[in-house]
Amino acid sequence: MQVEGPDTNFVSDLALGSKKRRLSKTSVQEDDHTNVVSEVNKNKKKKKAKPMTCTLLKSVVEKGIGIKDVRDMTQYLLQAENNSPKWIDICNRSSLQKMIVLFIPGLQPDDFENGKNTFNEISDDNFKYIPGEIASTFHTFPVMAPGSKMTLFSPYNSFINVGLSKMEKINKLKELQKKKKITINDLVLSEQQLVANDYPLDSGDTNFDTDWVQTVDFTHGGSHIFALDCEMCLSEQGLVLTRISLVNFDNEVIYEELVKPDVPIVDYLTRYSGITEEKLTVGAKKTLREVQKDLLKIISRSDILIGHSLQNDLKVMKLKHPLVVDTAIIYHHKAGDPFKPSLKYLSETFLNKSIQNGEHDSVEDARACLELTKLKILNGLAFGIGINTENLFTKLHRFEVKTVLLNDMIIKNHTEDDSKGQLIRCVEDDETWTHIHENLNKDVKLIVGRIKNLERSRNYNKKPRKETPSFDASMVLHDIGQHLTQLYENATPGTMILIMSGTGDTRPWNNLSTELEFIQDKKERLDKRREREPEIVEAIKLARGGVASFTVK
């Protein structure tokens, strides 16, 4: 009888089947493990980032917080600065989605609950014009405007100008020195510089009356670069134009006129202007309007005007022009910002010429500005400047932070828009609020704007360009409260809203400084300042005491 051997195929099949089952089981286990890991990772991804929190350190705040400190906090929140502020404890700054900074000059202590006499006494009081449940999320604290016991500087300028470290200054100087050859176009003020220095721009601004004119484009021969200087006398309404001198790039006087004032003169300021009643009576043949017409035939909108603090000349001429070289800006004061060098100092230091000895001469001053500009072109951008500050927005753009700046001094119908920032003209508060609401949920990290109607309603603004419409402070405050409420309700979580007055009550200081400005003799003005020093100190103290309030949704 033959005994058959085992079916090797069958055994193989059994073994293969067993292996397949083991592999299948292992595969399932591995799949299950993979799915579990995947689910865990998914849950980790779904886990929300911790919200940002900001806690005021009152013991530090009470010692004094300035606009600079708020600016540095802004840089830290936007991750353009690694040094955390010492006066506020910030956790999870990476969760910040957007920051809105609003300057609202004109705020007073009694606009807040339990309002005291000064902002220094405020301790987390709520803004009265926001509903309680939202107002309770705001944190209020005093902020000092820049200055000293005898001086007050611009809070807005302090916020938008960042001090540089020693190494940053060295690097900036090296960068400027790279471009050894420059043209006059490299010295023309940028829009942000025009805004920061209060240059009168654009015919559509309702803050300018109908007496203002604007240069227009036209073709002409000869020079396309002019230096300009004016002399002024004092009327009850302020300074008025009484002499104008225009010099071309070849240093030739091409326009020189004494101007008939259209209002009575109360002080000819002869010791400075060189103007006397007799000179004007005999020599002044043209009115301001006629001078404006002459200039519009000489200066095209595409030409360049050179002057020293030229915004003052343009204002008294009631003339708007966009292309300006300002020797008070292209050369720096030895003390740095916010000080501006005098033309006399620049002429003596860089031209080795003594000017303005006694009476001012507008031709001499215009020529000094022209020579200083030519000297700057020969020596490069680094010549005659201090490397102390950088524009906040310029710095933020280097860190890929998208910004929107809303300002009333930007040229009409011009929006500077690139991948990093927008510069939008807003003359009225309604326009500012509209653009803030429109950009609230757009891909923008920082929005900075100024609300002006409150200071107008309370006469905080020192020199309105024309008689502005009257505003009721209570109505303006309710409007501010309504907009802040809407912003909070519509903002995405992680949005910070920060409001700042910038200053305290500036009215007493405005009155004092106006009186002092009318004293043209330097020694007489200094003597008067010493005489009234106690009043000035108190007025400045009141003016520097501002407030800030913020919330994080």
Swiss-Prot record:
GO terms for molecular function: 3'-5' exonuclease activity; 3'-5'-RNA exonuclease activity; exonuclease activity; RNA binding. Its EC number is 3.1.-.-. Its main location: nucleus. One of its GO terms (cellular component) is nucleus. The modification Phosphoserine is found at S24. It is found in: Nucleus. Residues 225-373 form the Exonuclease domain. One of its GO terms (biological process) is tRNA 3'-end processing. Belongs to the REXO1/REXO3 family. This is RNA exonuclease 1. It comes from Saccharomyces cerevisiae (strain ATCC 204508 / S288c) (Baker's yeast).
